[in-house]
């Protein structure tokens, strides 16, 4: 993807700096860094406690839920987190079930949640985008695009800029 870097398999910021040939003391120049932590040992390595924003992203398959809760249970300090759900149903009962299995985690859940529908048409477009290393909206459901815009606006706090960028993506610019 143009102007987007992916760093997969790193265990801390210094590993990423070494890979990029940066001195350990150098600061990253990225506007945003999204870090997927699926291992509780990485909570401290990537210092989630001082992150500006934290998200818990999951589907409702039992394995994904339990593995995610396993990581959350290892938090040593309270952390504010927003839920991002990928689900077909998007019901309150799913959220209630998740809250039940996450009882005891040191999390202050953000009131807002973002739901992404899991529709076959969206999955097909996502796979095609990955294969082509491009970001295209054509073929994505309106619900998916809306969720993507909401999440992006939450991350960067600039709704006008996000709307403009989404219009450009829609036009293929």
What is each model feature region?
Residues 9, 33-37, 54-60, 82-89:
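Conserved beta-strand segments of the P-loop GTPase G domain that flank and frequently precede/overlap
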Residues 3-9, 54, 83, 111-116:
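Conserved beta-strand scaffold positions in the cores of enzyme catalytic domains, especially
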Residues 67-78:
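Conserved C-terminal guanine-recognition region of P-loop GTPase G domains, centered on the G4
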Residues 22-31, 46-50, 76-80, 108-110:
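Flexible, charged surface loops at secondary-structure boundaries
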Residues 28, 40-62:
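Inter-motif core of Ras-like GTPase G domains
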């Amino acid at each position: 993807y143009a102007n987007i870097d992916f760093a997969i398999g790193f265990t801390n910021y210094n590993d990423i700096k070494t890979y990029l040939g940066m001195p350990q003391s150098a600061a990253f120049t990225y506007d945003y860094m999204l870090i997927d932590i699926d291992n509780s040992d990485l909570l401290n390595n990537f210092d989630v406690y001082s992150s500006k924003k934290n998200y818990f992203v999951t589907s409702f398959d039992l394995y994904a839920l339990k593995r995610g809760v396993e990581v959350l249970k290892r938090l040593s300090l309270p952390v504010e987190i927003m839920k991002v759900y990928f689900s077909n149903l998007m019901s309150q009962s799913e959220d209630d079930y998740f809250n039940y299995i996450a009882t005891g985690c040191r999390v202050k859940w953000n009131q807002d949640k973002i739901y992404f529908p899991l529709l076959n048409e969206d999955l097909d477009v996502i796979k095609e985008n990955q294969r082509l290393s491009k970001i295209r909206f054509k073929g994505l459901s309106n619900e998916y695009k809306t969720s993507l815009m909401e999440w992006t606006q939450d991350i960067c706090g600039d709704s006008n800029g996000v709307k403009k960028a989404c219009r450009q993506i829609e036009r293929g610019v």
